Regions:
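Charged C-terminal helix
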Residues: 160-193
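Short, well-structured alpha-helical segments that form the helix of a local strand-helix-strand
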Residues: 82-91, 145-158, 174-182
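Glycine-rich phosphate/dinucleotide-binding loop and adjoining beta-alpha-beta core of small-molecule
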Residues: 1-117, 186-190
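Short beta-alpha connecting loops at secondary-structure transitions
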Residues: 71, 116-122, 132, 162-169
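Short, small-residue alpha-helix embedded
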Residues: 68-69, 124-155
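Alpha-helical transmembrane segments in multi-pass membrane proteins
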Residues: 11, 15-17, 124, 132, ...
Length: 193
């Protein structure tokens, strides 16, 4: 991370496994490139809401507990009206929110998509990291942030469905999703899915 200022970056997927690292968060938030923010970086933002202003147009991928801390609402409040709350938060902060769940909500405050692809096998630690990596790779290919978030959620979910069909939701791991994304993309591009 010492060289962040010295390199041209297309995108950064950030926050997974960084722990409590305020200096690194602020350094990454200043880098001029597309960003997807997840996990520990979302927890940092929940305690440092002024830093949201540095992330205009970025993608945030909270699960309901992370989003409750970020939005200052209880998980129950979030789950009772997730679409409207995610839309308002995205609009107020000029961000793309991917509220992860069985049906993920992807919104920029103006447009909202509900992603129903996926399976219960994704409810494991590390699956969100895979999603962030997929979205980050799409951002690096210059796909606009909202479209990258929508496509990334679909690709991750569809890949998980395919992996679960070949093994089971009980035995699948996030690495199985990550290593199968290429086959899913190939099938999508050939209109087989």
């Amino acid at each position: 991370h010492k060289d962040l200022d010295n390199h041209k970056l297309d995108s950064i997927a950030f926050g997974m496994g960084i722990g409590d690292n305020p200096k690194l968060c602020e350094k990454v938030f200043r880098v001029q490139c597309e960003k997807i923010i997840d996990a520990d970086a979302i927890n940092y933002l929940a305690k440092n809401k002024d830093s949201l202003k540095k992330l205009k147009g970025c993608v945030l991928t909270p699960h309901p507990m992370e989003f409750s801390r970020l939005a200052g609402l209880s998980v129950q409040e979030i789950l009772s009206n997730p679409i409207e709350i995610a839309e308002q938060f995205a609009k107020d902060n000029n961000l793309i929110v991917v509220l992860k769940g069985a049906t993920s909500i992807i919104t920029n405050g103006e447009q909202t998509y509900l992603n129903t692809s996926g399976c219960s096998g994704q409810a494991k630690g590390g699956s969100g990291d895979v999603l962030s990596g997929i979205i980050g790779s799409l951002l690096a290919q210059k796909i606009p942030a909202f479209e990258a978030a929508v496509a990334g959620c679909y690709i991750a979910g569809k890949t998980a469905e395919i992996v679960a069909d070949k093994s089971s939701v009980y035995s699948m791991l996030p690495v199985d999703i990550a290593t199968s994304v290429g086959n899913t993309l190939s099938s999508i591009l050939k209109d087989k899915i």
